[in-house]
Curated annotation (Swiss-Prot):
Family: Belongs to the WD repeat BOP1/ERB1 family.
Protein name in the entry: Ribosome biogenesis protein ERB1
Transmembrane annotation, as ranges: none
Regions of compositional bias (Acidic residues) in chain numbering: 21-30, 42-56, 86-102
Keyword Oxidoreductase: no
Coiled coil location: none
Subunit architecture: Component of the NOP7 complex, composed of ERB1, NOP7 and YTM1. The complex is held together by ERB1, which interacts with NOP7 via its N-terminal domain and with YTM1 via a high-affinity interaction between the seven-bladed beta-propeller domains of the 2 proteins. The NOP7 complex associates with the 66S pre-ribosome. Also interacts with NOG1.
Length: 807
């Protein structure tokens, strides 16, 4: 019994020592740990590990106690009772009143003597359900070297953009719900400098966690540079490791590899021969068909079993190179309908006329007929004849293949500037000069630009003030009783503004008038210039040839013929002093010609003017000199019907326009310089550009022709804008403008730029179509002329009015 008591006491003491040692270890661990009132994540993890460890130790101790109990069960019941009695006695002794007294010691004092024991083995031991040991290892804490997808973000606002916090002092909230304040921003100058001088690692993005700019670190920049240079990004990898030649690359001759070739390699295979003979027998018997023969059989079978699809799409076959397809028949018209409109049916007179004409001369080979239904239409009787004639045409008529050019039509249209950029030019009618009782055939503008003279079929010449439209002068030059067939054909002011002479062509006469509207000085200068020519022949200043003609009047026949020629030459026109009646009409002198004068044009100096008489033969063109009262006929032979004649603006050249040609003569050398071929059927008028290197001509076949005298004799441009005969064309003296007037009652205004560079062609741009004159008896605008300085246009029409068109 004593021994057993000693054992129990020793067990109790050992338990107390173990408990005291555990308390000491725990106290030492508490000293090592710093507890500040906050539970750290790592501390919690270690506590959890300790709890697991303690539970495992307790389970181990309980298991040992159970084993001891099992051993004690083997003792006898008597010994068990004795032990129980001793334990009860000991228990009564152990329980003391002091243990149940109030303990005033603190937890710190109680744990002051406790010592903790650290275990080196990190594994935790447990048991499975079958009783075997189970080792619970600690959790693995992975280290993320390159992936931070599971890392917690500092700013927990989710997918909300940072722009939602622009008006707030913070940029979001952290995991604890506290605000993340916005970082301080620099001044506008600092932001400007930062945008100019970009810092290293600048990305232009905002960091969602801090609200500041997101810059790349040096490691990230180095990584990007390595990727750009195609280098290794991991420093632990050695790209130049030493080569270990595990297997030799040199083939060695060994007994296993240098075996001699067997004989069967050089002897034909009997097995292959059997297989080949088997295939040959199958081909001979027809069980195997070669691919070529099989293809031929399929094509033959396809041709034999071919069925034409009547309603399928037609497939085009490749024609021969020399094959020309027949041209398609024109589609049927309304006349060929079985139920044509009434206006296509022929009247009895038209049917009779159609039947009386020859078959080859008929406009159509059938008579349009009307049927109430398509089923009532009979067969066409001329179908066989038409097919036969078409076959003859295809067989006998030669045909040529014409390759169609694939050209974009827009590429052929020249790129012209907008008319808005080419102003000024006339666009509206501002003044109407009304008062004439007949057609206004001609008009002319004074060199000063103040007075407008018009000539009409009523036999009057009127002078108008341009700005006000007031009539300031009127004279009647045609007496209907004496000369009923005369008209005022042409009227032209002298280009010299200091004399005020107005030349008027009336029938066969040319009147030089000085209207009393300028003042004494100008009127006196004009009359003096005209009167000075009367003394030219009086004082013996006649040509010697004319004197010789007069002296050889009684000579031989040759002398008589020569004198007759000179006499005719001298009598081409006669300068007559005005009668008293003509003086009352302000006529200073009258030049009488043989035929009707249609056109008149002054030289730029104002001393010469040229007239055109289309019906006068070789004397159709006459040059008159005012200062000497002389008239010359420069041509000995007629060059067709002359329509117009003009002087060159500054060269001694004369432009003569016939019905189809324009000839340029040099008056100083008396030679033909150039012959222009406009290509028109009947020219009406010409005008020369102020620079003298371009010419425009109008024709009665509705065309306006532009000739560049430095280029070929054919037209540079042909303008077909009018619908009827073009009567007049005129260049502006100062501005790059020209106009054309026609019988359709319209006036077309064009912009014409002539470049100094000889390599550039003139630029012609249509600007405006002026309408206002009425068409009377198929006559519209008869004449047009430009103002000397302004972009104003004057026009004369068959509606008895003249108009001023301004910008």
């Amino acid at each position: 019994m004593m021994a057993k008591n000693n054992k129990t006491t020793e067990a109790k003491m050992s338990k107390k020592r173990a408990a005291s040692e555990e308390s000491d270890v725990e106290e030492d661990e508490d000293k090592l740990l710093s507890v500040d009132g906050l539970i750290d994540a790592e501390a919690s993890e270690s506590d959890e590990d300790d709890d697991e460890y303690e539970s495992a130790v307790e389970e181990k101790e309980s298991s040992s106690d159970k084993e001891a109990q099992d051993d004690s069960d083997d003792d006898s019941d008597a010994e068990l009772n004795k032990l129980l009695a001793e334990e009860e006695g000991d228990g009564e002794e152990d329980y003391d009143s002091s243990e149940f007294s109030d303990d005033t010691t603190s937890l710190t004092d109680r744990l002051s003597g406790v010592k903790l024991q650290t275990i080196v083995d990190p594994n935790i031991y447990s048991k499975y359900a079958d009783g075997s040991d189970r080792i619970i290892k600690p959790e693995i804490n992975p280290v993320y070297d390159s992936d931070d997808s599971d890392a917690e973000t500092q700013n927990t606002i989710g997918n909300i953009p940072l722009s939602a916090y622009d008006e707030m002092p913070h940029i979001g909230y952290d995991i604890n719900g506290k605000r993340i304040m916005r970082p301080a921003k620099g001044s506008a100058l600092d932001q400007l400098l930062d945008s100019i001088e970009l810092p290293e690692g600048w990305t232009g993005l905002l960091d969602k966690n801090s609200g500041s700019s997101l810059n790349l670190t040096k490691e990230e920049l180095e990584l990007i540079s390595k990727i750009q240079r195609n280098e290794q990004t991991d420093d632990s990898i050695n790209p130049y490791e030493p080569l270990i030649d595990w297997f030799t690359r040199h083939e060695e001759v060994m007994p296993l590899t240098a075996v001699p070739e067997p004989k069967r390699r050089f002897v034909p295979s009997k097995n292959e021969a059997k297989r080949v003979m088997k295939i040959v027998r199958a081909i001979r018997e027809g069980r195997i068909i070669p691919p070529k023969k099989l293809k031929e059989m399929k094509e033959k079978e396809k041709i034999e079993n071919y069925q034409y699809d009547l309603w399928g799409d037609s497939t085009e076959t490749n024609d021969h190179v020399m094959h020309l397809r027949a041209p398609k028949l024109p589609p049927p018209t309304n006349e060929e309908s079985y139920n044509p409109p009434e206006e296509y049916l022929l009247s009895p007179e038209e049917k009779e006329a159609w039947e009386n004409t020859e078959y080859s001369e008929r406009e159509r080979n059938f008579i349009p007929q009307k049927y109430s239904a398509l089923r009532k239409v009979p067969g066409y009787g001329e179908s066989i004849r038409e097919r036969f004639e078409r076959s003859l045409d295809l067989y006998l008529a030669p045909r040529v293949r014409k390759n169609k050019l694939n050209i974009d039509p827009n590429s052929l249209i020249p790129e012209l500037p907008s008319p808005k950029d080419l102003r000024p030019f006339p666009i509206r009618c501002s003044t109407i000069y009304a008062g004439h009782k007949g057609k206004v055939r001609t008009l002319s503008i004074d060199p000063s630009g103040l007075w407008l003279a018009t000539g009409s079929d009523d036999g009057t010449v009127r002078v108008w003030e341009i700005l006000t439209g007031r009539e300031v002068y009127r004279t009647t030059l045609i007496d209907d009783e004496e000369n009923p067939d005369y008209h005022i054909e042409c009227i032209e002011w002298n280009p010299d503004a200091n004399n005020g002479i107005l030349a008027v062509a009336v029938g066969e006469n040319i009147h030089l008038i000085v209207p009393p509207i300028f003042g004494y000085d100008i009127e006196n200068n004009g009359k003096t210039k005209i009167e000075d020519g009367f003394g030219y022949d009086t004082f013996g200043t006649v040509k010697k040839s004319n004197l010789e003609v007069n002296e050889n009047g009684d000579g031989d026949e040759d002398g008589e013929n020569e004198s007759a020629k000179n006499a005719v030459k001298k009598q081409v026109a006669q300068w007559n002093k005005p009668s008293q009646k003509q003086l009352e009409k302000d006529i200073c002198i009258t030049i009488s010609c043989k035929k009707t004068v249609k056109k008149l044009s002054w030289h730029r100096k104002g001393d010469y003017f040229v007239t055109v008489q289309p019906d006068s033969g070789n004397t159709s063109v006459l040059i008159h000199q005012v200062s000497k009262h002389l008239t010359q006929s420069p041509f000995k032979k007629s060059k067709g019907i002359i329509m117009d004649a003009k002087f060159h603006p500054f060269k001694p050249q004369l432009f003569v326009c016939s019905q189809r040609y324009v000839r340029i003569y040099d008056l100083s050398q008396q030679i033909l310089v150039k012959k222009l071929l406009p290509g028109a059927r009947w020219l009406s008028k010409i005008d020369i550009h102020p620079r003298g290197d371009n010419l425009i001509a109008s024709s009665f076949d509705k065309r306006v022709l532009w000739h560049d005298l430095d280029l070929a004799s054919t037209p540079y441009k042909t303008l077909r804008y009018h619908e009827k005969a073009v009567r007049s064309v005129n260049f502006h003296k100062k501005l790059p403008l020209f106009s054309s007037a026609a019988d359709d009652g319209t006036i077309h205004v064009f912009h014409a730029t002539v470049y100094d560079d000889m390599m550039k062609n003139p630029m012609i741009v249509p600007l405006k179509k002026l309408t206002g004159h009425k068409v009377i008896n198929s006559l519209g605008v008869l004449d047009a002329i430009w103002h000397p300085r302004e972009a104003w246009l004057f026009s004369a029409g068959a509606d008895n009015t003249a108009r001023l068109w301004t910008t």
